């Protein structure tokens, strides 16, 4: 912060936010304080990646929320991915493509079932892109915002892009083709880069299993 090219006012704001994030890591028991010889010493309570980074504003929430998952669950690796994705900025073009495809599929199914036109239109309003763990994450974040006031500046956005690619065994080109999103290649590439950084550099090793490590390497 001190060496950055920000104005004094911006540096003060960054210092305040850094203090708030550090306090959050202490409150969530990621960091603990021990006093010795009249000095404070700070230690992490969990193993963190060598290049550990809080790349996203809600990375501290992600670390806390991982405690809600059952490592023995068959969907554990995918659920960790969903929690990470919820803290990322939305790749809006990709999500719109997902929603459009979901609505097109629903429309065809309703036509086949003989649902009348007006009813089909009403039902389509409730169809959107996939949002794994939406209820769990929304409830957890509501509580988190009560305990961490600065988090009120942000909101989680559950979505399934990386998870969707894994579940459908889609590579980059195949995924772009499936959603007819050739004009959104840059958006998808940036999103996947952000997702990789969060999974590789923020999720503690102890919260990763072999399946998740394989996905990150992929």
Stretches with model-predicted labels:
Residues 1-218:
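Non-catalytic terminal extensions of ATP-dependent helicases
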């Amino acid at each position: 912060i001190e060496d950055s090219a920000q104005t004094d006012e911006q540096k003060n704001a960054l210092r305040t936010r850094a203090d708030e994030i550090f306090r959050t890591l202490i409150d969530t028991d990621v960091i603990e304080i021990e006093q010795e010889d009249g000095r404070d010493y700070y230690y992490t309570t969990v193993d963190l990646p060598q290049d550990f980074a809080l790349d996203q504003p809600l990375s501290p929430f992600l670390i806390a929320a991982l405690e809600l998952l059952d490592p023995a669950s068959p969907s554990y690796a995918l659920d960790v991915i969903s929690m990470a994705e919820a803290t990322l900025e939305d790749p809006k073009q990709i999500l719109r493509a997902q929603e459009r495809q979901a609505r097109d599929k629903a429309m065809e199914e309703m036509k086949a079932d003989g649902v009348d036109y007006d009813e089909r239109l009403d039902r389509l309003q409730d169809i959107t892109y996939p949002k794994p763990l939406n209820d769990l994450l929304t409830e957890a974040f509501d509580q988190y915002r009560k305990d961490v006031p600065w988090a009120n500046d942000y909101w989680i956005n559950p979505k399934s892009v990386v998870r969707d690619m894994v579940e459908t065994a889609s590579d980059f080109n195949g995924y772009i083709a499936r959603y007819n999103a050739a004009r959104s290649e840059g958006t998808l590439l940036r999103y996947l880069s952000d997702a990789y950084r969060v999974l590789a550099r923020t999720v503690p090793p102890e919260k990763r299993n072999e399946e998740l490590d394989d996905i990150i390497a992929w």
